[in-house]
């Protein structure tokens, strides 16, 4: 028990001392997120072309490991940023979580977990590679979501924008625990009843994020929040696209199907 306790204390101290430095911290240069997004799209289109006349791969074992990895990683990020936000609340007050108190607000514990969240977006690109190799349908929403999140999360750190970043890290990680658990169960061939609730939760995430950022816009000047406007504008713009795209996906996947079934029942 002492070993575990000492490890946790040492790890907490390490995260408390975390510092994001543009051009110094690994993958902190703008070249990495933007080039990755372009390469990601090209690779997916290339894989689809290569697999066009081939049989889709099974990849069951790899998919199981991949989903388990992301369940563990997502749970760790959710727990980590929740603890970091709580510690900041104790040290600086709740208002520090909705209005940056300095130009270096995404540092220390909370900065560490937002950085891990940023890195996780690179790993999540493997989701699409698996779909392409399996010859599964890949919708625009999926590609746009994965492509956009790498540069968006990089900008949070680069511009030291705290408000939307810690909240998105917390809520998105929670949703991804459920989502990758669902993917794991479907890979194992087990039924999973809550698929549509994951999409609902994602829409709620974007709505709450948009509301939080909109509040930040209102108080930014009067409260002298120490962060630039650009990451907030980008995040709310991306959130608006996500709300529309996820809303359409939910309607097409669930509402339109239920209405078609109702019509069939009436005919019968």
Curated annotation (Swiss-Prot):
It holds the Pfam family ELO. One of its GO terms (cellular component) is endoplasmic reticulum membrane. It catalyses: a very-long-chain acyl-CoA + malonyl-CoA + H(+) = a very-long-chain 3-oxoacyl-CoA + CO2 + CoA. Disulfide bonds: none annotated. It is a multi-pass membrane protein. It is found in: Membrane. The chain crosses the membrane at residues 31-51, 62-82, 110-130, 137-157, 161-181, 198-218, 227-247. One of its GO terms (molecular function) is fatty acid elongase activity. Belongs to the ELO family. Could be implicated in synthesis of very long chain fatty acids. This is Fatty acid elongase sre1. The gene is sre1.
